Structures are given as structure tokens and as C-alpha cells.
């Protein structure tokens, strides 16, 4: 028991539970509603394994059941399951309504954070513009050197009137090579031709990643079309 590796985070505990109880927990995609009282079942089944404490199990369950993909799975007609995937009764309406409110609040928090970040960017840009518009100190004109009598004036070389236009800087993006590193609520970009649109991860499925664009439209996108 002393030689067992220790799980240091709730995400690691969830990954362990998904491997230990694949018919109950899932590491990605839509999650199934859990049986009421499943915490006690976990304590009895995995108590002592991987040096897991009750506090770690409770924290991992709280993170799992508050994730967007779990809240999406709490819907009318869905059935709760135990650790072995056996049905344990249909969801009650009050539980479905509670999950819906939690999901709405989570989305509102993400939108508020995004709006706050945009406001800070605008403030920084405005501050930079004010510095550029500040009056510059007047420079005193340099004294003109007098030409000696009899000296010939050298013709000035013609300066090029136009400068070659600079090539526009291409914005570099990092492609998403593994969707398992993504988390619900994470901000990224969706490639559309030569452009990349801002988006937020709503759900990670086997077919791809469901994202929501700033326009409010949601769609499922494959990993090769996602970048950071």
C-alpha cells in the first residue's frame, strides 16, 4: 500500500475513476448522471487504493459533477447509474432544473470573464494611443553651416519617393494535436480558410469538439481545424 503512486489532483482522480469504473465515469464526452449516494459506494470500493483520501474523492466528485459535460448529461429522461453502470432511477425534474441553472451560470461567468478581458485590452490600447498623441517637445533648429565662398554646391542624391510595402505579419497559431488536453470552457480558435475565429469549448466528443463561436453559434469541429 505504501508503494502505490499518489494522485495529486482532482483531474488525476477523475481519470483513475474513469479507468476503474468505465461504465459510470468518463474522461471525455457527455457524462452520465451518477447515483445519489455514490460517494459512500466509492469509499467502500476504492478506499485505500492509490492512497486516495475521502477529501480527494469528494473534491473530484464536486469537480466532475460541476463540469459542463456532466451538466449537459443531466436532462429529462436520463437515468442515474451506479459504479458498475446499472440504472438507479430516472432523474427528477428538480435535479434537471438545478443542473440547467448551474450550466447557465457557468456560461454567464465565462462570458463575463471574456468581456472583462476585452475591456482591459481596449483600455490598454486607449492608453497607448494617448501616449502617442501627447505633444512632443519642440526641437531647436540646427544652425545652417555656411558654405565657403567659391565652393561648388554638390547636387543632392535623389531619395526614393516610395518605400516597398511591408508584408503583413502572419499570426502564428499552435495546432491542437490532442483533444484530450482540452477542457470545457477553454478559449481557442477555429480555422476557417485563412482566418481563425475565437471560440469556447462546450463539449469534447468522440467525433470532435463542440465549440461556441462569439456569434453564439455552436458546432462540432475536428481537431485539425482547432488552434491555440
From Swiss-Prot:
* Signal peptide (UniProt feature, chain positions): none
Which residues does the annotated region (Disordered) include?
107-178
Q: Which domain of life is it from?
A: Bacteria
GO CC annotation terms, alphabetical: cytosol
InterPro entries per record = ProQ, ProQ/FinO, ProQ/FinO_sf, ProQ_C
| UniProt xrefs under Pfam families | ProQ, ProQ_C
The alphabetized list of GO BP terms reads: post-transcriptional regulation of gene expression
Q: Which GO terms describe its molecular function?
A: RNA strand annealing activity; RNA strand-exchange activity
**Which stretches does UniProt call biased (Basic and acidic residues)?**
117-136, 146-175
Q: Per its UniProt record, what Gene3D superfamilies does this chain match?
A: ProQ/FinO domain
**Localization of this protein:** Cytoplasm
Q: Which UniProt keywords apply?
A: Chaperone, Cytoplasm, RNA-binding
Query: Which family is it part of?
Result: Belongs to the ProQ family.
Task: Name the HAMAP family for this protein.
Answer: ProQ
Q: Please explain the role this protein plays, according to its UniProt record.
A: RNA chaperone with significant RNA binding, RNA strand exchange and RNA duplexing activities. May regulate ProP activity through an RNA-based, post-transcriptional mechanism.
What is this protein's record name?
A: RNA chaperone ProQ
Organism listed in the record: Salmonella typhimurium (strain LT2 / SGSC1412 / ATCC 700720)
Which gene underlies this protein? proQ
